[in-house]
Amino acid sequence: MSNITILDEATANKIAAGEVVERPVSVVKELVENSLDAGANRISVELTQGGITGIKVVDNGYGMPAEDVQLCFLRHATSKIKRAEDLNSILTLGFRGEALPSIAAVSKVTLTTRTEDELAGTTMQIEGGYMQNVVPTGCPVGTIIEIKDLFFNTPARRKFLKTANAETSQVSDLITRLAMARPDVRFELRSGNRVLFSSPGTGSLKDTAAVIFGLDNVRSMLEIGYQGKLLSVAGLISKPVLTRASRHYQNFFINGRYIRSGFLSSILQQAYDTLIPAGRFPIAILHIDIDPTQVDVNVHPTKMEIRMAREGEIQEELLAALSDSLNVPTAITGLWEIMPGRTKNTATDQRAENLEVKPDSKEKELQPKESQHPRLVACDLPSGKIMPPRHDQEQLHFSSRRIAPVRGKNSLLPDEGSSINREEIPPVVDVKEQQLKENPNTYQPAETLGFPVLVPAGQVPPTYVLAHGEGGLYIIDQHAAHERVLYEKYLYLLGNYVEAQMLLEPLTLEIPHHEAQLIIKHIVDFNELGFILEHFGGDTFLLRGVPTNAITEPKEVFLDLLARLQENPSQKVEKNLVLDHLAAAMACRDAVKSGQHFSAVETKALLDGLARCQKPYTCPHGRPTLIQISQEELKKRFKR
């Protein structure tokens, strides 16, 4: 007796549906892409319980004739291609004929459609892959498709779905990307009676981007337009001053299709090399048109991944297009933090004065004009703010409010109520504890044992500092070294006392819906970390308070944390990890950048600060801060 069984069609369809239909967002993607292929310029998506119990998509496309209504639910039935050769030049979003039968196999579907040539439309109902009835009906031109009880007949799949809010967030993220792909189409996303997202549909990418990212961010973006031999590029890319902590805000569209591509993301990052710090990523909306014969979209069931021929030439042209847009004066506006003038009446200000960056000239004076040159952030100051706001920003006003101490593995202070033998604690801990009580911003660590005593010897523009010591010659990465110094200072301060600075004028945050749900879920956790938030209705929040040491760019720091939280699969606010990221983000932003020229005083201050770090040999991102060339290696190289 044969052990091989030919599965019936219904069972085969349920299995095949697993490749195409993973969750509600998969259904929405397939249905909306069908609407776009049908020429619709108005598409409405309505969710019930995040799409788990209901999805309704309405479009004003050209609809389907009555004879095609039943055919569209047959597997591999499609109007997009006729033969295999058509795959070489496919421009539609769908083409396999798998989506509708896969959706129908695991849900209850009602399809209503009419073409312009027909007097009456057609309604068809399918349940679990089996047709229930087909009747004529009155309806406008276009298509209405309703999906109910997704995975009702496959409970194993249904139990792995997330909460309604989580599923809604995924759909919201998809719709915003589709709106960027087609700014000429008006998209609307609703959950119950609430409108979550609505794009203008004016055809302007800037208008659409302003709705998604906010008008202020769009003003900090550059338009890109390029026509080459192999491809054309259009879209928006952020100025180097506008970055995020993840690649989530990078959007690539090949021939109108949204894709995920590490290849394209690496090219984008290469274009920003030396313009933004490591670990920071630009925002981008890039529409790339390529000869369809050079692109294979038939790679993955979701069609989110593609293959491209002639990748080397594509990389060369795309990099040229991006570099041309970034090599304009307006592209780097605001890249440097400039010290505004202020009264210098404290020891902190006087010591900061000695660390002012010297311009690249033959002048011996160490006092450049503050309006012309960036200032090196003091790396060993015992107190004071790091990097005040830029001169072109509004001055923020604060009032203090103490937040309960946040303690974790990075805390240098004992837990309250713990039993302590004072004789076992080195004196330096008692000193630090006393300093911290008197002035929470005080931080002056002891020198690290084993770290070489370095004597400054000069600078190798634009990035490196030379020094010599017992071990030979040392080459220091100025940005990485300063980043490590600031990171340990910030981590110390945040790990012991989180003090919130209350803004007299709160900052308004307009957040995409899927991120707004995370804020609502974790708003108490954020408050404990010093980010005092108030839900202002819809997807708008008021940022009323920020951690003391994050006041230079509080909005950017908070959005970075939100991006990291979104990347975390568990989407839990783990305080130690958040504090670590907050310290690293502030250090990366405030550290000196490549190209700053140091005086001898500034170089000595940087090396002294590095010597006091607990882990002076790498920056927070794991890059080395310095390398050593031993005396033996030098003698060998010089044949001695």
Swiss-Prot record:
Give an example GO cellular component term for this record: mismatch repair complex
Pfam families cross-referenced by the UniProt entry = DNA_mis_repair, HATPase_c_3, MutL_C
| Keyword terms | DNA damage, DNA repair
Highest taxon above the source species: Bacteria
Q: Which Gene Ontology molecular-function terms are recorded?
A: ATP binding; ATP hydrolysis activity; ATP-dependent DNA damage sensor activity; mismatched DNA binding
One example of a Gene Ontology biological process annotation? mismatch repair
Q: Where is this region: Disordered?
A: 343-389
Q: Which cysteines are joined by disulfide bonds?
A: none
Spans of biased composition, class Basic and acidic residues?
Answer: 350-373
Q: Which PANTHER family match?
A: DNA MISMATCH REPAIR PROTEIN MLH, PMS, MUTL (PTHR10073), DNA MISMATCH REPAIR PROTEIN MLH1 (PTHR10073:SF12)
* Family statement: Belongs to the DNA mismatch repair MutL/HexB family.
Function recorded in the entry: This protein is involved in the repair of mismatches in DNA. It is required for dam-dependent methyl-directed DNA mismatch repair. May act as a 'molecular matchmaker', a protein that promotes the formation of a stable complex between two or more DNA-binding proteins in an ATP-dependent manner without itself being part of a final effector complex.
Question: This protein is called what?
Answer: DNA mismatch repair protein MutL
Q: Which organism is it from?
A: Desulforamulus reducens (strain ATCC BAA-1160 / DSM 100696 / MI-1)
- The gene coding this protein: mutL
